[in-house]
Structures are given as structure tokens and as C-alpha cells.
Amino acid sequence: MTKSLFDVLKELDSLVDFSRAKLQWDILIILATKGPSSTTEISQTINTSRKSIIDAIRKLVDKELVTKVKHDIYGLSDKGKELWNKIDSVLNIEVINGNNHKGQSKDEDILALENLSQYFYLINLSKMITINHDGLSLDKAARELGVSRQTLKYYLELFEEKKLFRVIGKRTHFKKNIYKCVLMNEGKRLLFRLPEFTKMKNNLPLKLLLRLTNSYTLEMANVKVMGFILISLPLLMYFRDQLGLIELPWLYAVIFLALLSVFAQILSR
């Protein structure tokens, strides 16, 4: 017989006290919806000190609801996933996971990618790898995506295990590791069927804009272009009588970058 709502809530409360463990619930929700995350990323997401996050995660590990995945990255354990399924039965929250795709074909299983967070990282990492043939700086990529370096490295290694990417080289540049990556055949076969990736591949203004602004994402490139324009226009107006031959090329550069940004945005839709 199906459990009543009261019985389910009572069982959940016995595992994680609703009244005293709000932070633990916040962490469980983040791990269930975003996938494995670092303590720094969790701390930034819920605006709580990292020390408090570490203490709360330690309690969740003791309760066997959370497990350490790698380095500073934590994810839901089997018991934690079971708990989340019970929450789902009460609140009807749909979280995609690997257990939901047993009857699907290999392509459908890869497309599902266990949860939406993997889809997010797959698309963004693939874009960066495709455009930046010189290599990928995890520190820079993590900063532009707003995630921790450990989290990004975890997903890069995960996709390498799934044979979607392959790291073919690694070098150090100004004390930062640059990863030379390529898409594997399985990754190409999957990604080239996605409209979002196809648009990016044919978006020449986007590729040029990212190169000129030394950016990995369109959002960061637009921020840099906007900053350049906001600084340039007042300077051009104030020093217009002193710039001489520099003024016209500078003005053309402002207009060119602005138009490039607009066309890159339009072709990305």
C-alpha cells in the first residue's frame, strides 16, 4: 500500500531533521539538481561560509547520504539518491539520473547524460574545445562559467571516461595548466546532432569575437566588448583634438567589435 504523505515526511525527518538541518537540506538539493559539486561551489551557491558547508557535508557523510567523489567534490550516495526519490514522491520533483534510462538505447542514454548538469558542462566544454585549438585553461574556463576548477576538471575527466573527449597533451603557461583536448568520434556523433552546437560551429562572428577578446564564452566576450566601448567613447570625445591618426582606427575598432558582438548574438539564437 502506498505510504501516506505524513508517513513519508516522518521518515525523511528521521534522516535529516527538518527543523535543525536546513543547511544540510540545501546541500542535498544542490547535489541532486546540479550533480557532483565542490564545497566552494556549494558555498557560493547558497551564500554560506565554506567552513559551515564542510561541517554540514561531514554530517551528511556520516549519515551515508553524501559521498566523496574526488578531491573536494561531493555527490549523493545511493542512500542519498534513495532519499531524494522519496522527496520526489512527495513534491513530484523530477531529477534525471542514470537509473531512469535502463531501457533506452545507447544514444538516448548518452543524450540523457544522467542529469542536466552533465549536459550543461558537455555543451560548454565542447564549444571551448572546438574553438580553442591551442588548449583549454581550466582556471579561465571555470571563472567564465562561474564554477570551481575542481568541478570543471571532474566533468572533463568524466567525459574522457565516456570517450566523448580525449586529453592529448598538457602544458604549463604562466603557472597555469593548459589542456589540449579533442572531440572523440562518439562525442562528434552526439554533438553534431544538437542544434545548439551546430549553430556555434557555423557562427564565424562568434569564433572571431572569442579570438579577439581572448574569451571562452559569448557572455564574457560581450562583457569585454562593452567595457572596451564604455572606456573608449569618453576617451575619444575628450581627446578628439589630440589623437590625430589614432582616432579613426580606434573608432573603427569600436564599431567593428560592437557589430561583431551583435551578429554573434543573433546567429547564436
Curated annotation (Swiss-Prot):
**One GO CC annotation, please?**
plasma membrane
InterPro entries noted in UniProt: HTH-type_ArnR, HTH_MarR-typ, WH-like_DNA-bd_sf, WH_DNA-bd_sf
Q: Name one GO molecular function term.
A: DNA-binding transcription factor activity
Q: What induces it?
A: Induced during starvation conditions. Regulated by ArnS.
Per the record, ranges on the Cytoplasmic side are 1-218, 264-269
Classify the protein's membrane topology as the record does.
Answer: Multi-pass membrane protein
Stretches that traverse the bilayer: 219-239, 243-263
- Record's function text: Involved in regulation of archaellar gene expression. Activates flaB transcription upon nutrient starvation by acting on the flaB promoter.
Q: What is this protein called?
A: HTH-type transcriptional activator ArnR
